[in-house]
């Protein structure tokens, strides 16, 4: 089993797809990486030679921030926005949507479950 950036790549998948299991690498970056390292995208992970794995590992480490480093950077950026008090930081702090979505309805995932409001009752039929 090939191991790149701390992730075990699935043996049965094509290399182009398997690389997307690494956080920070999608289909586009996967294709770019394979082109730069001269690895055939249709090769299965189990068929990769040790030399190809080393080339892929070196290329990814040299050119991309992935996995833990990328996660740390994202968290640091969010923390910095919260500290300087910009609009996005305030939205993060209040656990509301950050990218301009509506909140009058929807946004339940970000806001959490509904909370009952004391004193408000539905009008009954007479």
Swiss-Prot record:
Pfam families: Ribosomal_S13. Keywords: Ribonucleoprotein, Ribosomal protein, RNA-binding, rRNA-binding, tRNA-binding. It comes from the Bacteria. GO terms for molecular function: rRNA binding; structural constituent of ribosome; tRNA binding. The keyword tRNA-binding applies. GO terms for biological process: translation. Residues 95-126 are annotated as: Disordered. The keyword rRNA-binding applies. GO terms for cellular component: cytosol; small ribosomal subunit. InterPro entries: Rbsml_uS13_C (IPR027437), Ribosomal_uS13 (IPR001892), Ribosomal_uS13-like_H2TH (IPR010979), Ribosomal_uS13_bac-type (IPR019980), Ribosomal_uS13_CS (IPR018269). Part of the 30S ribosomal subunit. Forms a loose heterodimer with protein S19. Forms two bridges to the 50S subunit in the 70S ribosome. Belongs to the universal ribosomal protein uS13 family. Located at the top of the head of the 30S subunit, it contacts several helices of the 16S rRNA. In the 70S ribosome it contacts the 23S rRNA (bridge B1a) and protein L5 of the 50S subunit (bridge B1b), connecting the 2 subunits; these bridges are implicated in subunit movement. Contacts the tRNAs in the A and P-sites. This is Small ribosomal subunit protein uS13. It comes from Frankia casuarinae (strain DSM 45818 / CECT 9043 / HFP020203 / CcI3).
């Amino acid at each position: 089993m090939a191991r790149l950036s701390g992730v075990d790549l699935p043996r049965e998948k094509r290399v182009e797809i398997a690389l997307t299991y690494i956080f920070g690498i999608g289909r586009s970056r996967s294709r770019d990486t394979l082109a730069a390292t001269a690895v055939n995208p249709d090769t299965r992970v189990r068929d990769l030679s040790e030399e190809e794995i080393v080339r892929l590992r070196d290329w990814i480490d040299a050119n991309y921030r992935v996995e833990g480093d990328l996660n740390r950077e994202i968290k640091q950026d969010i923390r910095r926005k919260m500290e300087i008090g910009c609009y996005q930081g305030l939205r993060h702090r209040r656990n509301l949507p950050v990218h301009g979505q509506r909140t009058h309805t929807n946004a339940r995932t970000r806001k959490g479950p509904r909370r009952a409001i004391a004193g408000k009752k539905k009008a009954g039929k007479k």
